[in-house]
Amino acid sequence: MPVDPLNGRREVTVSDVAAAAKVSKATAARVLGGYGAASEAVRDRVQAAAEQLGYHPNALAKTMTTGRSNSIGIIVGDIENPFFAQATRGAADVAKAAGYDLILLNSDEHAVAEENAISVLLAKRVDGILVAPASTTDPSSLREAVERARPMVLFDRVADGLDVDTVVADNLAGARRLAQLLLDAGHRRIAFVSTIAHADEYRVGVRLGSSSVDDRVRGFVGALADAGVDDPARFVRLNARDGVPAVVRALVDDGITAIVASDSLIAQAAFRELRTLGRRIPDDVSLVAFDDADWTSLSAPGITVMAQPIHEIGAEAARLLIRRIAGDGAPTEHVVLPQRLVDRESIAPPRS
């Protein structure tokens, strides 16, 4: 006899509803599960009995019967990052409109945690999975879901060797444009700062573990190289997850006059450290970033950013996934959405 753990009362079962509606258990199950045939009069009696008794469907039982859970899993890299909060909201808006619940899990950008999250979602029998992959170059943690024919869509990043739909922003073009703004202002000693883990100093041609960061670095380095800056890769700073202030201090000591932050959290840490060091933005150091976080428009000065269509990235990923769940067998899609420059007051010519 199932008991509700919250109030200690016996849970209302399909059998209870069937008895109250004076129909068979199989008929009540069909009506409550939304499958099979039943007359309108029978449906009305069953639904009225269910409402009167306070019946709540057993999600697992419904999944076993219909093969669908009407749920979607989403795995993000860092739930504290505003990017993932907005992308998740976009996915949730589309999922809700289509009748799906969303289950959110965090990978902390680690493949092992991502693999565990995949296992949890498969155990919950989700109908499909959205993932911002922890690694572009080694997506082995995602293969179980693909091998089990569970629809999957990647967002924000791609993953080598996985034939699945992807939705990303045009990070290559966005980085080139940010770098060009600084070059046009007269800067030559421009640094790019990211928290992505990387074993060695950055070298041109080396793939980074996140395709979004890799595209940004390549766009940044390409713009500087085209402008004749000698060995622009030497200005790329990685592995700053726990040490953005230390990286900024070293850059200032090295005579850097401008910084491109790979996301708004890095930009915020850099902004604070420059203030701590007594450096004025943009008079002493220019600062630009990816992502139009709220603080970038409220700070003094406002920060020039490359705004990503974050809500739309999540929403489009969910749309693609729901189409796959419905059986769409079209070739996989790689959707690239444009970014938008928000020009504020954080760029000035370098001091002579």
Residue ranges and their predicted role:
Residues 2-6, 52, 93-98, 147-154, ...:
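Bacterial carbohydrate/catabolite-sensing allosteric modules
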Residues 14-23, 28, 38, 46, ...:
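Hydrophobic packing within well-folded, soluble alpha/beta domains
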Residues 30, 75-76, 106, 130-133, ...:
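Small/polar loops that bind or transfer phosphate-bearing groups
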Residues 1-70, 348-351:
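N-terminal helix-turn-helix DNA-binding module of bacterial transcription factors
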Residues 36-40, 112, 283, 312:
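Residue-level preference for short helical/loop micro-motifs built around acidic side chains
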Residues 20, 27-30, 65-79, 189-206:
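Short beta-strand segments enriched in small/hydrophobic residues
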Residues 1-15, 44, 59, 67-184, ...:
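Alpha-helical recognition/docking segments in bacterial nutrient-uptake
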Residues 11, 39-43, 58, 66, ...:
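Non-catalytic, surface-exposed connector residues within folded enzymatic/regulatory domains
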